[in-house]
Regions:
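SAM cofactor-binding core of SAM-dependent methyltransferases
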Residues: 1-62, 108-110
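Conserved acidic-Pro-Pro-aromatic motif
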Residues: 12-21, 26-29, 49, 72-79, ...
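Hydrophobic packing residues within well-ordered alpha-helices of enzyme cores
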Residues: 42-43, 65, 88-92
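A Trp-anchored, charged/polar loop motif used as the substrate-binding/catalytic surface
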Residues: 62-63, 82
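Conserved amphipathic alpha-helix within the SDR
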Residues: 64-70
């Protein structure tokens, strides 16, 4: 979800896409959703997955998943939809849809930087409370945080990586032996 380029023009259909790797190198299938019509028209013929152009501030994520016949057990979901991030997260029916692996972009570093520059300490504490709340929701649905506050190319923290209890139990030894999240995630995603 949020398979676009983050507002950056690109001729590369995988530019800034968490899911493109799995499609291109693991032969995974799925659905890519983004509100950017420029993204949609630039990648709809170059991606193997189904590409959907929808504004997730306007349309409920569960409707889109249902309309596109997504299974109730989804191997991987990446939620990176900027302004619609928290709406999608709160709308998502965790009772119906289960995920083996979930990445949720939070861009906490940008949010806190903005709070420091433009907002009060009270606003910063409100943001941190919301951030903790989404982690509590995922934990309450049985997800385990694999890596918190993952940094991306010197930016960070940008996202958290979560796994289902089953995946966590299956790969706990890899996780505990490695601080290299890319190595462990590569094993998990095979």
């Amino acid at each position: 979800i949020g398979a676009g380029t983050g507002g950056l023009p690109s001729s590369n259909p995988g530019f800034y896409s968490n899911t493109y790797f799995f499609e291109a190198f693991r032969s995974w299938t799925g659905i890519a959703i983004d509100y950017d019509s420029d993204w949609y028209f630039s990648v709809k013929n170059s991606r193997n997955c189904k590409c959907v152009c929808e504004d997730l501030l306007e349309k409920n994520i569960n409707e889109i998943l249902s309309e596109n016949e997504c299974p109730e057990l989804i191997d991987y979901i990446s939620i990176d939809v900027d302004d619609a991030q928290w709406k999608v997260f709160h709308d998502l029916n965790f009772s119906k849809y289960k995920f083996n692996v979930l990445t949720l972009e939070h861009n906490l570093f940008q949010t806190l930087e903005s709070c420091t520059q433009n907002r009060s300490e009270e606003h910063k504490q409100k943001v941190l409370k919301e951030y903790d709340a989404y982690r509590e929701v995922l934990s309450s649905h049985g997800y385990k945080i694999l890596w918190a506050d993952v940094n991306l190319d010197g930016y960070g923290p940008v996202e958290d990586w979560w796994v289902s209890q089953e995946i966590f139990d299956r790969y706990a030894d890899i996780y505990s032996e490695s601080n290299n999240f890319k190595e462990a995630f590569n094993v998990i995603s095979r």
